[in-house]
A protein has these predicted regions:
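N-terminal leader/targeting and pre-domain segments
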Residues: 1-54, 159-162
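A structural signal for the main folded, soluble domain(s) of proteins
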Residues: 32, 51-53, 114, 129-133
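Short active-site neighborhood of thiol/selenol oxidoreductases, capturing the structured segment around
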Residues: 54-65
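Thiol-based oxidoreductase modules, predominantly thioredoxin-like and allied folds used
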Residues: 62-63, 77, 85-110
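Conserved redox-active cysteine motifs that mediate thiol-disulfide chemistry
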Residues: 64-73
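Acidic, Ser/Thr-rich peripheral helices and adjacent loops at domain boundaries
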Residues: 106-120
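Non-catalytic, surface beta->alpha helical segment in thiol-disulfide oxidoreductase systems
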Residues: 119-162
Length: 162
């Protein structure tokens, strides 16, 4: 069931941080993500703005190594977090669909049970929660309004902050 308020402590304790996410990458898909991570160069001024605006928020990332868009977007986001570790973020990986069951979007396990707490439709998805655990914005698959991930996240925070 989709929650309106999420337990921040639970999310932080049941997920992985960026260093562990990168460390656990393996196989061909993992190598592609690592290459994309190394290559990504965020816009420094925008990244600084994101770091400032992100204070008090938690970024929750759902992804899978096999996912084409995840290999790009999650690698870029991970690079941003490595450069700005003050941006509070957690990662859930290993998302798998349930193609043989039309009543279930994501198969749990192997997908983490937290997929059912969010209205997760596609991956990658980056949810932004306020300090109370309320969803204030999301980015699904790729930036929709801005050319780069960091600009899109600033845009989402600006909209939420009014």
């Amino acid at each position: 069931m989709v929650k309106e308020i999420h337990d921040i402590k639970h999310l932080e304790n049941s997920s992985v941080r960026v260093d562990e996410m990168i460390k656990n990458l393996s196989g061909t898909d993992g190598e592609i993500i690592k290459e994309n991570f190394e290559k990504y160069e965020p816009i420094e001024e925008v990244l600084s703005e994101l770091e400032e605006k992100a204070k008090g928020y938690l970024f929750v990332v759902f992804s899978a190594d096999w996912c084409k868009d995840c290999k790009i977007v999650v690698a870029a986001f991970a690079k941003m977090i490595k450069l700005r570790p003050a941006i509070n973020s957690v990662f859930y990986k290993g998302i798998k669909s349930a193609p043989k069951d039309p009543d279930i979007r994501w198969r749990v396990p192997p997908s983490p049970p937290e997929v059912n707490d969010f209205d997760l439709r596609k991956i990658p998805t980056i949810y932004i929660l306020d300090s109370n655990g309320k969803l204030i914005g999301e980015m699904i698959e790729n930036p929709e309004h801005k050319p780069t991930l960091e600009e899109e996240l600033v845009y989402i925070l600006d909209k939420a902050q009014g």
